[in-house]
Structures are given as structure tokens and as C-alpha cells.
Amino acid sequence: MKGKTSGQKMLLTAGFMAMATLLSKVLGLVRDSLLTAYFGSGLESDAFLTASTIPTTLFDVIIGGVISAAFIPVFNDIMSKKGKDEAMKFVNKFVTLIVCITLFIVVGGIIFRDVLVNIQAPNYTADKHNLAAQLTAIMFPMVIFTGLAFSFVGLLQSFGEYNIPSIISLVSNLAIILYYVVFGKKFGIYGLSVTMVIAWSLQFIILIPWIKKFGVKYRPDFKFKDPYIKQMLLLAGPMLISTWVQPLYSIVNQRFASNIDSAVTYIQQSNRLYIICLLYTSDAADEL
């Protein structure tokens, strides 16, 4: 009976996660549609989409894969062999390291924003390039919240909590949609860029009470010369390279799209629709 109850719980959790993911993608499509509805499919929308992908792409290339591929396995290994206290010490060092790395990325990204825009969209007009560079500088701080949110999601999943991580994207998408409806015409594309940072910070903030629920109490720890940190970095090396495919694909897409006016916006929306269709058809196939 106990096994059956556990199986039912897993099934409900999987169903909830699938629905939350699908709903989040649908809201993402609504969010992107509102972008073109309020700002058109031209200078502002292209510049915004380029600027919003630069920080996340850089994050994915540098440390995105480390969290899922190396941090969580090492954390789980410490939990099983050394206990929770030792695992929490590792968490403190890792989170401190993530904050330091993401701060470095933010500062470097803001300083070299023009170079990054040229890499991502080399064929933009001067006006579109300048706007994209300005918006990139505004949105780079979201890398910090991205790193923290990814880390906390991994921790919660290690503790067996999957429902809360699956809804955080819903909250951020709703926050952006709310901006369009209430403030879109008043604060324009610059306000939208600030809202993107706020939306990512909300993902991080929502996770804090749940992290505390499982006994995680963060204390800054700069002792990075730690065998577990070294183990994590050695494990991350080969895996990190494999995570570069999607970010590099995104860069190549935008480089080609920057040749054509509004193409960046159209590609973003078509990719979003493709992902929704893929999720829907894969779920339907699972039912057969």
C-alpha cells in the first residue's frame, strides 16, 4: 500500500510539473506577443530580444551547466557520505562562488556590452545597436539572480521538492505580462528591461522560504580551496562543453537574423511556438 501511495504521489508530481511547464511556455508566448503588440516588430523589439539573450547566453556558456551537471551530484554525494552539516558547508562555499562569478560576469558584461552586441547581432543599424547595448547593460544584473535561482532549484530537487521549482517561471512571466498591461505605455522598453531583472529576482525570492524549510541557512564562505569545490570543477569541465550547443546555436541564429529587419523578433516567437508544440506532442505521445 505504501509503495502504491508513493507511486501515486510521483505521478501527481510529474503531472503537475508537466502542466506547469506547458503553462509557463504558453505564458512566454503571450509575453512575446505583447512585446510586438506594444513595441512592434522592429527596432525596439529586436534590440530588446538581443539584449535579453546576451546575459543568459553568457551565463549558460560560463556556469549554467556546472549547477545541474556538477554541483548537485557532488552535493548529493556529500549528503549521503558526510551528512547534512558538511553538505551545508559546501553549499555556502558554492553559493558564494556563484555570487562572485556572476558579479564578475555582470561587471564585464556592462563594460563590454558593445562588443557583445556586435558578436550577437553584427549587422544592426547604429540606432538599433545603441539601444541593444543600453538594454543589455540594464539587464545584466539578472545573471546574479539566475545563478542563485538555478542553485536553489537544484537544492530543492535534491530534497525531493519539485512542485515549487516548476512554478517559478509562471511567476516571472506573469510579472512581465502585468508590466505590459499596467505600465507598458508609460515606461516603454526601458521599463520592460528593468522588469526583466525584477522577474528573475522574483524567481530567486520565491525559493528562499522553501530553502529555509529544508534547513539551508546561507553564510558567506570564501574558502574556495576545498576538495569538494575542486571535485565539482573537475566534474564540470567536460560536461560544460556539452552545454554550449544551445547557447551557440542561439548566437548563430541571431547573427544571421540581424541581417534582416524584424527577423530576430520573428525567430524568437517561432522558436517559442515550436517548443510549445514539441511539449504538447511529446505529452500526447506518452499517453499512447
Tell me what each language-model feature is.
Residues 11-15, 49, 85-100, 104, ...:
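Interfacial transmembrane-helix starts/ends
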Residues 36-57, 234-235, 257-277:
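Interfacial/gating helices of multi-pass transporter permease domains
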Residues 1-10, 208-246:
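Interhelical loop/hinge segments that connect adjacent transmembrane helices in multipass membrane
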Residues 105-126:
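Short membrane-interface helical motifs at transmembrane helix boundaries
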Residues 125-151:
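Alpha-helical transmembrane segments of multi-pass membrane proteins
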Residues 280-288:
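Single conserved hydrophobic/aromatic residue that forms the stacking wall/gate
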